[in-house]
Regions:
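OB-fold and OB-like single-stranded nucleic-acid-recognition modules
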Residues: 1-290
Length: 290
């Protein structure tokens, strides 16, 4: 989540949104960059939470939340009139974000616009053990999650896919994408990654501006995959994106039917393999019996 000053946009194009869902086991909580606090260039507080989710024994998806102190937060109220639903919002000073709706002088039908989290268990009125559900500003979610997350927790996560680019020291433009969670919840049952009957949930959905499709090749030999090229339109940037497909029939349909610069929605599975390397260590004799 980039620091957003909501300055006037340089172009008037609708943003293309992307979302994802994961179920798996938390990992990387012991890494140095798991949770960090700092300051922005303008002196505002910032927090970062970085962790992984193992969705298969050899597949890990990285997640990252970047959040900043803001002047205010917003509360939302839904009003239903017949089949029509309307929404009202009210801005609340940042320092008052933890106050109850009663303390803020709002009714019970108002709620904070924020991220959902359920990383603790509690017993409800029916005697059932359920997740303790909270709604927090992303800034507060990072700290709370860092205190309640642990490796190998079974979780369900959903959120937004963020894109951006930067220019490296060599002048080369580099693209990046980030899975930014808006919900982190414990699952009702423990997840066994080795269960062959388990249905893997590691999915994304992305609206994009289609530009081209081509067959992927290595050393001029087709790999069996096709690369879909497109543009992701953000609030203040337009970034390149690539998606891969293996369905040859669908690839032909894209090539013949989808015109360049059409707005399309793509979806599929997130596959990020865990890189491993076997290293041979020369035996120095330590620990061996005489």
């Amino acid at each position: 989540m980039a620091e957003n000053t909501k300055s006037k946009r340089l172009f008037n194009l609708p943003e293309t949104k992307g979302t994802f869902q994961l179920e798996g086991l938390i990992t990387d909580c012991a890494k140095d960059d798991f949770y960090k606090e700092g300051k922005t260039q303008k002196g505002k507080d910032k927090r970062t939470l970085s962790f992984g989710v193992k969705v298969e024994p050899d597949v890990k998806v990285g997640c990252k939340i970047k959040a900043f102190e803001k002047p205010k937060v917003y509360f939302l109220k839904r009003e239903k009139n017949g089949e029509k639903t309307t929404y009202k919002t009210k801005d609340i000073p940042w320092a008052d974000r933890f106050k109850s709706v009663k303390e803020l002088g709002l009714g019970d039908d108002w709620s904070l616009i924020g991220s959902r989290v359920g990383l603790e268990k509690e017993t409800n009125g029916k005697g059932q053990v359920v997740n303790k559900k909270l709604v927090l500003d992303p800034f507060d979610l990072t700290k709370y999650a860092s205190e309640h997350m642990a490796d190998n927790q079974s979780v369900f996560i959903k959120g937004d896919i963020e894109y951006g680019s930067f220019t490296g020291g060599d002048g080369t433009k580099r693209q990046w994408s980030r899975m930014s969670p808006t919900q982190i919840s414990l699952t009702s049952k423990e997840i066994d990654l080795d269960d062959e009957e388990r249905k893997v949930r590691s999915d994304f959905k992305q609206t994009m501006v289609f530009t081209n499709i081509e067959q992927e090749k290595e050393n001029d030999v087709p790999t069996g995959r096709f690369i879909v090229y497109g543009k992701i339109i953000g609030y203040s940037s337009v970034d390149d994106a690539e998606f891969y497909m293996t369905n040859k029939k669908l690839a032909k349909t894209f090539d013949k039917k989808v015109k360049p610069y059409s707005s399309i929605e793509v979806w599929g599975h997130i596959k990020t393999e865990i890189q491993t390397e076997e290293v041979e260590v020369e035996d120095d004799g330590w620990g061996e019996a005489d």
